[in-house]
């Protein structure tokens, strides 16, 4: 059996639609349409998702690329549980955690050339925003403060922080936040154009 019956949030039946869909404001979703026809995922195993209707789907995007190793992997669950029981979080401001240094060393062994320094973040948006700031800080430290140019791609998505939206090319995001986006960003054409078909 692919999915076992289990309750993991509370004693409520997680296969039903919650009593209220008002409090959770969902990104990139027509909340009105969602309320009329909710699409809920109740469980995941490997590359499969289970809906509240009991249907199984393939998770082709790894939940926005956040679960590339698959869902519900026992060895990952055990390793995470062990770490949470030992130390659940250690902020890296002027204090270190040995595990993060070990992970950085392991990653560095697999990266090309001199790409051997790691800066850990909590999500893709924060990673992009941090990379933008590192690039700006690097050139300022080298005496090139005027060097401030970024290249993005039309229709590109890099996250929802202001820097991410600035280098991204999602039309509605750029229109909505145009007055507060970073200067010095140019966009190259998207590859999905009629002449490329």
What annotation goes with each model-predicted range?
Residues 105-197:
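PLP-dependent aspartate aminotransferase-fold enzymes
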Residues 38-59:
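Active-site and channel-lining beta-strand-loop segments
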Residues 8-45, 95:
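Active-site-adjacent loop/helix segments that line or gate small-molecule/cofactor pockets in enzymes
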Residues 14, 39-43, 70, 74, ...:
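Electropositive phosphate-/nucleotide-binding environments in soluble metabolic enzymes
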Residues 23-26, 65, 149, 157:
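Tryptophan-centric aromatic hotspots in well-structured domains and transmembrane helices
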Residues 1-8:
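Short, Lys/Arg-enriched N-terminal segments with co-localized hydrophobic residues
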Residues 28, 56-144:
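Glycine-rich loop-to-alpha-helix module at the N-terminal edge of alpha/beta enzyme cores
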Residues 1, 54, 150:
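Conserved S/T- and glycine-rich ATP-binding loop of Class I adenylate-forming
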């Amino acid at each position: 059996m692919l999915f076992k019956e289990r309750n993991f949030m509370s004693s409520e039946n997680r296969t039903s639609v919650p009593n209220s869909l008002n409090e959770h404001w969902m990104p990139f979703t027509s909340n009105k349409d969602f309320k009329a026809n909710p699409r809920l995922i109740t469980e995941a195993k490997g590359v499969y998702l289970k809906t509240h209707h009991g249907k199984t789907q393939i998770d082709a995007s790894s939940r926005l690329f956040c679960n590339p190793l698959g869902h519900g992997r026992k060895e990952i669950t055990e390793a995470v549980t062990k770490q949470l029981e030992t130390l659940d979080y250690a902020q890296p401001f002027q204090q270190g955690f040995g595990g993060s240094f070990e992970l950085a060393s392991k990653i560095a062994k697999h990266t090309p050339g001199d790409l051997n320094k790691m800066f850990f973040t909590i999500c893709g948006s924060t990673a992009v925003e941090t990379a933008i700031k590192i690039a700006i800080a690097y050139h300022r430290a080298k005496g090139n403060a005027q060097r401030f140019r970024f290249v993005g791609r039309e229709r590109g998505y890099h996250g929802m922080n202001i820097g991410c939206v600035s280098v991204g090319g999602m039309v509605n995001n750029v229109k909505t936040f145009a007055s507060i986006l970073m200067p010095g960003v140019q966009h190259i054409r998207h590859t999905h154009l009629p002449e490329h078909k």
